[in-house]
């Protein structure tokens, strides 16, 4: 079933290479099992599915299927190159080398050196880190089968390194899940208490959100602006971070959800904003224009916080469909490959410049050159990502 999902979600019309990689990986991992007792092949299959869901090219999906064969079986880089080409072999080699990084949560020098190595791997081919993120995400999804000590170690490593890198790459789909899974194992009591509290309020909140969505949708429609309007709950780690940083209870956190408006053009974004500000009173100082001033990870949207019908503040985010894709998939949305019908099925890069793909990376590489001190490098990186504050990470 997983193999069918991987093929179904792949954007490639040429699935023969993916099928071949599956059979090679299955045979190479024959007799190996995960801690869960499942056949080992389930893991690379799930990694490949995550990559296919990001709509990456077939070479990346193939490398995802093969990412553990060099480290865990007798298969060599040379054999991979011979069977699947140099491009796939280089991707697998890059992921293998990243898997050999040491980690020590208490040593800044070790963390900084690991991040430097990751950035160098990204500079060679960003797809290496995308495979590694997919690998880490599936490992976090199955972390319950590890010992409690290993759970905390992997969760800490994920929160300290992998979630921030997903944030830097703008891949919110992966970043959010890594954050929530890390919190689940680092602070289980707080996590399950939060899940319970939110579940208790779910029916009332859902009714309120649906009413707001319908009101907004109707007003936007009346203004002649084609739009998709929906409501979404904020993820657990985001809520927990606010509760800790602001010393508040769940009932004191007002933005547990956001209304999202997706339109066709930038012009429609600002037109929709005008409609919204006529409907509800905006809270001064709570408007952010990330369209005019995008975040370093390419995120663009208009954010505004308003007073709702019951007097409760709520947030609305407005973006185009293209901006929404970038918000969900980040750098992966700019690393897509299309299959050309007139070139024998060879993948060709889409018309996205290297400048667009790697603008975020150049800044970090410049920091690396400028930072002679590892502690200074980590301090600057952490402050930029805004995900490493002492308040958030003083877990026991």
Language-model segments: which ranges?
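Edge strands and adjacent loops of beta-rich recognition modules
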Residues: 385-387
């Amino acid at each position: 079933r997983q193999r069918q999902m991987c093929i179904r979600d792949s954007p490639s019309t040429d699935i023969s290479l993916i099928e071949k990689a599956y059979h090679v990986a299955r045979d190479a991992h024959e007799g190996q099992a995960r801690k869960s007792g499942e056949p080992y092949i389930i893991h690379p299959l799930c990694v490949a599915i995550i990559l296919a869901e990001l709509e990456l090219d077939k070479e990346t999906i193939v490398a995802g299927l093969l990412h553990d064969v060099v480290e865990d079986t007798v298969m060599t880089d040379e054999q991979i190159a011979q069977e699947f080409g140099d491009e796939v072999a280089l991707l697998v080699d890059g992921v293998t080398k990243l898997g050999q990084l040491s980690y020590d949560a208490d040593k800044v020098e070790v963390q900084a050196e690991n991040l430097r190595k990751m950035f160098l791997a990204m500079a060679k081919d960003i797809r290496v880190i995308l495979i590694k993120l997919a690998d880490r995400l599936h490992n976090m999804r199955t972390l319950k089968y590890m010992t409690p000590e290993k759970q905390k170690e992997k969760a800490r490593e994920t929160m300290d390194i992998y979630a921030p890198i997903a944030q830097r790459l703008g891949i919110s789909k992966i970043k959010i899940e890594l954050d929530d899974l890390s919190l689940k194992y680092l602070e289980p009591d707080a996590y399950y208490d939060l899940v319970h509290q939110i579940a208790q309020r779910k029916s009332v909140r859902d009714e309120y959100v649906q009413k707001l969505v319908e009101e907004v949708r109707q007003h936007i429609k009346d203004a002649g602006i084609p739009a998709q309007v929906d409501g979404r709950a904020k993820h657990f780690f985001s809520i927990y971070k606010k509760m800790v940083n602001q010393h508040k209870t769940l009932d004191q956190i007002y933005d547990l959800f956001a209304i999202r408006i997706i339109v066709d053009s930038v012009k429609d974004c600002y037109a929709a904003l005008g409609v919204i500000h006529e409907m509800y009173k905006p809270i001064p100082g709570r408007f952010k224009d990330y369209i005019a001033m995008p975040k370093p990870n390419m995120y663009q949207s208009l954010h505004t916080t308003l007073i709702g019908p019951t007097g409760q503040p709520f947030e609305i985010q407005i973006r185009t469909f293209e901006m929404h894709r970038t918000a969900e998939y980040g750098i992966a949305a700019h690393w897509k490959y299309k299959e050309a019908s007139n070139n024998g099925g060879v993948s060709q890069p889409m018309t996205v410049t290297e400048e667009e793909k790697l603008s975020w990376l150049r800044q970090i590489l410049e920091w690396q050159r400028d930072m002679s001190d590892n502690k200074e490098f980590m301090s600057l990186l952490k402050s930029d990502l805004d995900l490493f504050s002492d308040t958030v990470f003083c877990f026991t």
